[in-house]
Amino acid sequence: MKGICILGSTGSIGVSTLDVLARHPDRYRVVALSANGNVDRLFEQCRAHRPRYAAVIRAEAAACLRERLMAAGLGGIEVLAGPEALEQIASLPEVDSVMAAIVGAAGLLPTLAAARAGKDVLLANKEALVMSGPLFMAEVARSGARLLPIDSEHNAVFQCMPAAYRAGSRAVGVRRILLTASGGPFLHTPLAELETVTPEQAVAHPNWVMGRKISVDSATMMNKGLEVIEACLLFNAKPDDVQVVVHRQSVIHSMVDYVDGTVLAQMGTPDMRIPIAHALAWPDRFESGAESLDLFAVRQLNFERPDLARFPCLRLAYEAVGAGGTAPAILNAANETAVAAFLDRRLAFTGIPRVIEHCMARVAPNAADAIESVLQADAETRKVAQKYIDDLRV
């Protein structure tokens, strides 16, 4: 039986992971859970799964959880507090696998800690890899950690790739990687109407159930841009070899086009429990709880090229991965700051790419050869982005 730590257990991916794990109590034991501050949900998860540790970033929330666990007779669960607690539980000796499901840059250090400790890293936090790039991959190679992608697109590519893909996509006969995108809720919205889009409209994804931040990223297609960067790193591919294809039905989750004309596609219902179960069981398979795909109900599949005028964030992501170094970290920090402002109604939806473009022009990228360089670029960009947003409101 394997021990698992779930970073971000109260979020969408964390909840889905626990749903899958509950179906296979003979395969995994939950060693540690973590949350930012959702004490109510974390308490219920602790009561259901009885982890040894529960880590909470906010100290006051940790104190509240500790009191509730004691009152419920669950005082044996050790409650840890602070960002460093996440790194601690991610590298515990009794943990074999780490589900890295914290959204945004906050997940970087604990995910990196899991990689350094040689764990099986089930990577749902794309920002950690986008920010640290080759530095993260070097730690994976050094420690012998196994990196298993959870994003539906990268998990699909992983399933369609030959085992030797780390030698380089071209070296194993891959012509290109085709990442599918739903196009989000505004694929056909008149451009003039995007200026007045509300947070409620932006988070209403047509196919997937996701958190608020990633739903906005899907609406701007920054989510797909981050996935392009992630695909280059995971599969040792060049940016020109990763193509985005708008596929409205979200039935094909991605494809791999080989030099002999073969195209392999991974298909399934849009349910994150499928890639989660694949990574948890790999190299085996087990039941996920998701419905099987009914091809007769699907009936047709449509594909189109993304409109970069409608989705400038996708263009900016390609520019960042082409620039290299800390440019992807700058892109990510600017996007996170802009999305937070949009969700807080302090920035228009169309202001998100403007903030990112401003930051990429103002913050010079450096070599991403140390974690300190990455964190410095992240911090500097957030300041530049926030000032730009504040100036827009004056």
UniProtKB/Swiss-Prot annotation:
Q: Where, in this chain's numbering, is NADPH bound?
A: 10-13, 38, 125, 127, 211
Q: What is its EC number?
A: 1.1.1.267
Positions binding 1-deoxy-D-xylulose 5-phosphate in this chain are 126, 152-153, 182, 205, 218, 223-224, 227
MF-aspect GO terms: 1-deoxy-D-xylulose-5-phosphate reductoisomerase activity; manganese ion binding; NADPH binding
Q: Which EC class is the enzyme in?
A: oxidoreductase
For this UniProt record, the keywords arranged alphabetically read as follows:
Isoprene biosynthesis, Manganese, Metal-binding, NADP, Oxidoreductase
User: What reaction does this catalyse?
Assistant: 2-C-methyl-D-erythritol 4-phosphate + NADP(+) = 1-deoxy-D-xylulose 5-phosphate + NADPH + H(+)
Q: Which Pfam families match?
A: DXP_redisom_C (PF08436), DXP_reductoisom (PF02670), DXPR_C (PF13288)
Return the Gene3D superfamilies for the record: 1.10.1740.10, NAD(P)-binding Rossmann-like Domain (3.40.50.720)
Q: Which InterPro entries match?
A: DXP_reductoisomerase (IPR003821), DXP_reductoisomerase_C (IPR013644), DXP_reductoisomerase_N (IPR013512), DXPR_C (IPR026877), DXPR_C_sf (IPR036169), NAD(P)-bd_dom_sf (IPR036291)
- Indicate yes or no for the key word Manganese: yes
Q: In which pathway does it act?
A: Isoprenoid biosynthesis; isopentenyl diphosphate biosynthesis via DXP pathway; isopentenyl diphosphate from 1-deoxy-D-xylulose 5-phosphate: step 1/6
Q: Which cofactor does it need?
A: Mg(2+); Mn(2+)
Q: Which domain of life is it from?
A: Bacteria
BP term (GO), one: isopentenyl diphosphate biosynthetic process, methylerythritol 4-phosphate pathway involved in terpenoid biosynthetic process
User: Which residues make up the binding site for Mn(2+)?
Assistant: 151, 153, 227
Protein task: Catalyzes the NADPH-dependent rearrangement and reduction of 1-deoxy-D-xylulose-5-phosphate (DXP) to 2-C-methyl-D-erythritol 4-phosphate (MEP).
Query: PANTHER family, alphabetically?
Result: 1-DEOXY-D-XYLULOSE 5-PHOSPHATE REDUCTOISOMERASE (PTHR30525), 1-DEOXY-D-XYLULOSE 5-PHOSPHATE REDUCTOISOMERASE, CHLOROPLASTIC (PTHR30525:SF0)
Similarity-based family: Belongs to the DXR family.
What is the name listed in the Swiss-Prot or TrEMBL entry for this protein?
Answer: 1-deoxy-D-xylulose 5-phosphate reductoisomerase
